[in-house]
């Protein structure tokens, strides 16, 4: 959406061969934005379907409660060792646990203590402006024309160094800007949800 004081910025993410990369988190931050964020007004959901976390990657604002319903017929024990957002939801089916509120920004790796092949991620950001790329590697952000922003991307598959995953965008005088991230390193394989060892990015 574009308002009288805002413009849509299209963000494109492509791999080292120029192919679009889907399901990449994209978010924009203004200088000092983390100090004046309003409290989230809605919760988010990460379901458990066919022994997989759905969505595999969830992006939320700091302070957002996340529900972890279990839509499978088998029990799950959901947990994370990611500091400082550690949590444990003992074995359950259905919706037996209250939402978990994530008060700290960063990457949260999610697992199941019963099914080791289950792996999901929550990216907690100090921003109200975030989304994910579609199958064409495209995401759109509605930004204030009077502000400067740092646009960043993240995915568990990306191996490029962090310094290459953020770009500054000057909105004044640049309505309808485009930002392109051309990754230089080969992506990690997508998580297939098959049995095997887990890979934790943070403990």
What annotation goes with each model-predicted range?
Residues 26, 65-70, 108-110, 114, ...:
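A short, solvent-exposed beta-strand micro-motif common in secreted/extracellular proteins
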Residues 1-8, 104, 124, 132, ...:
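Beta-strand-rich domain onsets/edges
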Residues 9-15, 26, 68, 137-139:
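A short, amphipathic beta-strand motif
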Residues 97-99, 136-143:
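Short, surface-exposed beta-strand/beta-hairpin micro-motifs centered on an aromatic residue
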Residues 41-52, 59, 91, 130-136:
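Short, acidic Ser/Thr/Gly-rich low-complexity loop/linker segments typical of extracellular
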Residues 17-41, 73, 116-119, 145-147:
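Short, ordered, surface-exposed loop/turn motifs in non-cytosolic proteins
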Residues 4-14, 188-192:
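A short, Gly/Thr-enriched small/hydrophobic beta-strand-prone motif that recurs across taxa
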Residues 88-89, 93, 124-133, 157-178:
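Structured interaction patches on ligand/partner-binding surfaces of diverse proteins
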């Amino acid at each position: 959406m574009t308002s009288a004081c805002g413009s849509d910025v299209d963000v494109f993410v492509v791999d080292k061969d120029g192919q679009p990369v889907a399901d990449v988190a994209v978010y924009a931050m203004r200088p000092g934005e983390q100090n004046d964020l309003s409290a989230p007004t809605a919760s988010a959901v990460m379901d458990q379907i066919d022994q997989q976390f759905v969505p595999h990657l969830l992006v939320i604002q700091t302070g957002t409660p996340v529900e972890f319903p279990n839509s499978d017929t088998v029990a799950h024990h959901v947990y994370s060792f990611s500091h400082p957002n550690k949590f444990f939801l003992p074995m359950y089916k259905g919706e037996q646990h209250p939402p978990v509120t994530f008060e700290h920004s960063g990457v949260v790796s999610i697992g199941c203590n019963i099914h080791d092949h289950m792996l999901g991620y929550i990216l907690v950001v100090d921003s109200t402006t975030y989304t994910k790329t579609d199958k064409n590697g495209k995401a759109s952000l509605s930004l204030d024309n009077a502000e400067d922003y740092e646009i960043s991307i993240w995915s568990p598959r990306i191996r490029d160094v962090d310094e290459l995953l953020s770009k500054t965008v000057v909105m004044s005088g640049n309505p309808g800007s485009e930002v392109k991230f051309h990754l230089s390193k080969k992506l990690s394989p997508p998580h297939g949800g098959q049995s095997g060892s887990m890979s934790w990015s943070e403990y």
